[in-house]
């Protein structure tokens, strides 16, 4: 092999190795930021035909309907815990430390983004509520198959909303 071809081959191999390293680093960085969507049933039973369950500490999004009567608020802080359900009937607890969206209601569809604390508990850092009476995020609509609770409010809740 003459020196010119040897130099050209060395340059091509160096560029290929650099490109492979960059692609590997980009894929590794992206894998750390992927948030997979789960329903409560998929979280408990596993997702797909292989019944793959997320690991504790994994980032994920979970969507379902807030179970009426399950919202527990800490009186000393902004911490809130509530349960989600889908048509599979499995319950998952979501813990959130922050201000819930104005449209958050019991019996309504939500999507929470956070990390898996244990098999049936998600520690959320973001909670998204549906937009109006008729809108439901597509993932939640598929998961619940129209299993929508009509919210029932007490007189105290209705008075509090008018003030």
Curated annotation (Swiss-Prot):
One of its GO terms (biological process) is cytochrome complex assembly. It is found in: Cell inner membrane. The keyword Kinase does not apply. The chain crosses the membrane at residues 9-29. Heme binds at residues 131, 135. Its main location: membrane. It is a single-pass type II membrane protein. GO terms for cellular component: plasma membrane. Keywords: Cell inner membrane, Cell membrane, Cytochrome c-type biogenesis, Heme, Iron, Membrane, Metal-binding, Signal-anchor, Transmembrane, Transmembrane helix. The keyword DNA damage does not apply. Residues 30-163 are periplasmic. GO terms for molecular function: heme binding; metal ion binding. Residues 1-8 are cytoplasmic. NCBIfam families: PRK13165.1, PRK13254.1-1, PRK13254.1-3. Belongs to the CcmE/CycJ family. Heme chaperone required for the biogenesis of c-type cytochromes. Transiently binds heme delivered by CcmC and transfers the heme to apo-cytochromes in a process facilitated by CcmF and CcmH. This is Cytochrome c-type biogenesis protein CcmE.
């Amino acid at each position: 092999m003459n020196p010119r071809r040897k130099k050209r081959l060395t340059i091509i191999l160096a560029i290929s190795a650099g490109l492979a390293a960059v692609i590997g680093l980009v894929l590794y960085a992206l894998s750390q930021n992927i948030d997979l969507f789960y329903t409560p049933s998929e979280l408990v039973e596993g997702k797909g035909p292989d019944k793959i369950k997320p690991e504790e500490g994994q980032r994920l999004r979970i969507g379902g309907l807030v179970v009426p009567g399950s919202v527990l608020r800490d009186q000393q802080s902004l911490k809130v815990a509530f349960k989600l359900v889908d048509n599979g009937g499995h319950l998952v607890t979501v813990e959130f430390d922050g201000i819930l969206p104005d449209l958050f209601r019991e019996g309504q569809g939500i999507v929470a983004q956070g990390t898996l604390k244990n098999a049936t508990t998600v520690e959320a850092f973001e909670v998204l509520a549906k937009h109006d009476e008729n809108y439901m995020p597509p993932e939640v609509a598929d998961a619940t198959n129209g299993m929508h609770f009509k919210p029932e409010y007490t007189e105290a809740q209705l008075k509090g909303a008018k003030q």
